[in-house]
């Protein structure tokens, strides 16, 4: 479940798990170093998660075989067919707002990376995932000014731990209408249907037109009868409260309708309401199911990139949207004059103590698409702390994905089923209870808590592709299904990863040319170095007959000036390293992505684990303020 977003400070120093965890860290780090991440495989698993979350009558050709049909009478008692759609997370409520956001993000991935998905033979599966959501939205939109936006109640649902196939909790449905408006969820559903319409247009024109019809009607409903959805729907407020209000969703829906139709009335809407609705005023450091401003600003920047001078009459406003988009991007890249997204010591963006990975995935998506926009226009991102090339933006986005897949201080994949070391006690009812095909007897409401929720056994069903909430602000993770803030996956967290995986899977392999120092650069030696290195071994152990060491290197700035650029040569390194960022040149490293300067007297901490002798570290090049 989602909650309000709390900010948590981070530090630039690396923290390593206790000695008891070091062998696991070593094994995982070695596998990370030995081979590149399989983004295509991760993409495949990401789509499996959406299959596992399906509600309703499941198709015979489904790939997730441990799931069965469920909730086959949703809405019937209230005279409407609401069978289908997706369960939100580890429970069985169908929350309309995050579900619609997830479909929007899946569709945006297709819009941007259709070719990559076709080349990787994944497009049909992504479109199937989108259609499972849009079919439900079309059914839920029963009148022009009415939309069913929730099935199930979070409070009663959470009192039971049972499989979807055994559900005994009330399946009450809730709707918004002219007397009980909900502009956020109506606007987001309009955005989802418009984005999906564009994704389907080349392949199913009639279906695309149907989605557009519903999208336009829902946008008009959201805009004409304005009101916060969680004022009308108290049962959603506890779980998905609207902190940002509904104005971002109105702009977001209009932007997607313009993207899908090219109809100028929607571009006029986002231009005329830009200031009043906060589109050109909000400078944010998060993008989520609640706050759409960063996504809106990036999407409208695309219009400027594509149309340039032909967007006459709107160009000035679009440039204001773009300025706010670039504020967000520079904040992610740690180049925003101190107004940056917080980072964990291991290099993960950290926005919230609750389900932080959803912000990582959405930010990685925006960084990835914007990098491509810039590359196609031969532009660069100009941040307060320096210019950033498209390839560097993509590299940072990839660093976040790599962290997710295992390049992190715990050496753990936070995507279930990816790699050999991943969460096995996920906060998810279906994953934690044996499948109905393995154990046909009904699991009762409280029986599920006694036998499975509190069990120390690993999940009997692997929830392939689920992106859990992730580690805390210090890169620590407790693999415990009671730890719902960190161990629960969500639709909103997974959806943006689809497009990012498609893009990264299609990228060419990295080249690692030999580094050639600049003509006046210092030679690779410690003579005259601006840094004083202190190298210590803080732990040692034996694994598989090999002695391993945990090395900690502190590099103190002794030159008397702030260092704004640093290039290190690290030779004879065989293990994973933390605290510096690898460059494309062999054996060359620079400041970590979350660090832009090292003040006089300050220390940079580098940690690595390997067998045999210590690595050799030397300063190759540096600049001072």
From Swiss-Prot:
Signal peptide location: 1-34
Glycosylation sites: 440
SMART domains linked to this entry: CBM49
SUPFAM superfamilies, alphabetized: Six-hairpin glycosidases
One Pfam short name: CBM49
Region (Disordered): 509-530
Reactions performed catalytically: Endohydrolysis of (1->4)-beta-D-glucosidic linkages in cellulose, lichenin and cereal beta-D-glucans
One of the GO biological process terms: cellulose catabolic process
InterPro entries the record matches: 6-hairpin_glycosidase_sf (IPR008928), 6hp_glycosidase-like_sf (IPR012341), CBM_49 (IPR019028), Glyco_hydro_9 (IPR001701), Glyco_hydro_9_Asp/Glu_AS (IPR033126), Glyco_hydro_9_His_AS (IPR018221)
Record's GO cellular component terms: extracellular region
Keyword Ligase: no
Location(s), subcellular: Secreted
Record keywords, A-Z: Carbohydrate metabolism, Cellulose degradation, Glycoprotein, Glycosidase, Hydrolase, Polysaccharide degradation, Secreted, Signal
Active site positions, chain numbering: 91, 427, 479, 488
Membership in a protein family: Belongs to the glycosyl hydrolase 9 (cellulase E) family.
Name this protein carries in UniProt: Endoglucanase 13
Organism listed in the record: Oryza sativa subsp. indica
Lineage: Eukaryota, Viridiplantae, Streptophyta, Embryophyta, Tracheophyta
């Amino acid at each position: 479940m989602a909650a309000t977003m709390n900010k948590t400070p981070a530090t630039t120093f690396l923290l390593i798990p206790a000695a008891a965890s070091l062998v696991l860290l070593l094994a995982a780090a070695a596998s990370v170093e030995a081979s590149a991440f399989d983004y295509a495989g991760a993409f495949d698993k990401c789509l499996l998660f959406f299959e596992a979350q399906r509600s309703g009558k499941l198709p015979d050709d489904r790939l997730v075989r441990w799931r069965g049909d469920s909730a086959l009478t949703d809405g019937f008692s209230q005279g409407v067919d609401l069978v289908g759609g997706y369960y939100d997370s580890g429970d069985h409520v169908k929350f309309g707002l995050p579900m619609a956001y997830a479909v929007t993000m899946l569709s945006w991935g297709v819009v941007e990376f259709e070719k990559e998905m076709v080349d990787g033979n994944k497009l049909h599966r992504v479109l199937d995932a989108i259609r499972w959501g849009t079919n439900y939205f079309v059914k839920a939109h029963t009148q022009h000014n009415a939309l069913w936006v929730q099935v199930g109640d979070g409070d009663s649902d959470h009192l039971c731990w049972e499989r979807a196939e055994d559900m005994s909790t009330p399946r009450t449905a809730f709707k918004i209408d002219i007397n009980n408006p909900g502009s956020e969820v109506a606007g987001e559903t309009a955005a989802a249907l418009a984005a999906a319409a564009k994704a389907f247009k080349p392949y199913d024109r009639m279906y695309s037109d149907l989605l557009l019809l519903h999208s336009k009607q829902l946008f008009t409903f959201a805009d004409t009868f304005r009101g916060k959805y969680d004022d009308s729907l108290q049962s959603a407020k506890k779980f998905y409260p609207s902190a940002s209000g509904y104005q971002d969703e109105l702009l977001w829906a209009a932007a997607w309708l313009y993207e899908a139709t090219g109809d100028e009335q929607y571009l006029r809407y986002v231009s005329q309401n830009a200031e009043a609705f906060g589109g050109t005023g909000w400078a944010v450091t998060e993008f989520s199911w609640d706050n759409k401003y960063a996504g809106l600003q990036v999407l409208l920047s695309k219009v400027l990139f594509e149309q340039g001078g032909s967007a006459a009459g709107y160009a000035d406003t679009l440039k204001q949207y773009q300025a706010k988009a670039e504020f967000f991007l520079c904040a992610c890249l740690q180049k925003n004059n101190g107004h940056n997204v917080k980072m964990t010591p291991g290099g993960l963006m950290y926005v919230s103590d609750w389900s932080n990975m959803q912000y990582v995935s959405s930010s990685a998506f925006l960084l990835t698409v914007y990098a491509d926009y810039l590359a196609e226009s031969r532009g660069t991102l100009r941040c307060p702390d320096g210019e950033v090339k498209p390839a560097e933006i993509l590299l940072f986005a990839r660093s976040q994905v790599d962290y997710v897949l295992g390049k992190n201080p715990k050496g753990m994949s936070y995507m279930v089923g990816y790699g050999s070391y991943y969460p096995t006690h996920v906060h998810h009812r279906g994953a934690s209870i044996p499948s109905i095909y393995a154990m046909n007897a009904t699991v009762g409401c409280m029986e599920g808590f006694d036998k499975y929720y509190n069990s120390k056994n690993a999940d009997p069903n692997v929830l392939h592709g689920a992106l859990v909430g992730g580690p805390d602000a210090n890169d620590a993770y407790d693999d415990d299904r009671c730890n719902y803030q960190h161990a629960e996956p969500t639709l909103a967290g997974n959806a943006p990863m689809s497009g990012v995986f498609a893009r990264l899977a299609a990228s060419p392999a990295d080249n690692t040319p030999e580094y050639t120092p600049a003509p006046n650069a210092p030679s690779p030696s410690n003579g005259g170095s601006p840094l004083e290195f202190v190298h210590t071994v803080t732990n040692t152990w034996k694994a598989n007959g090999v002695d391993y060491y945990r090395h900690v290197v502190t590099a103190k700035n002794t030159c008397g000036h702030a260092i704004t650029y640093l290039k290190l040569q690290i030779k004879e390194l065989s293990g994973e390293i933390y605290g510096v960022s690898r460059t494309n040149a062999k054996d060359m490293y620079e400041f970590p992505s979350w660090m832009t300067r090292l003040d006089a007297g300050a220390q940079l901490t580098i940690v690595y684990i390997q067998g045999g002798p210590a690595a050799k570290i030397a300063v190759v090049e540096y600049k001072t303020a």
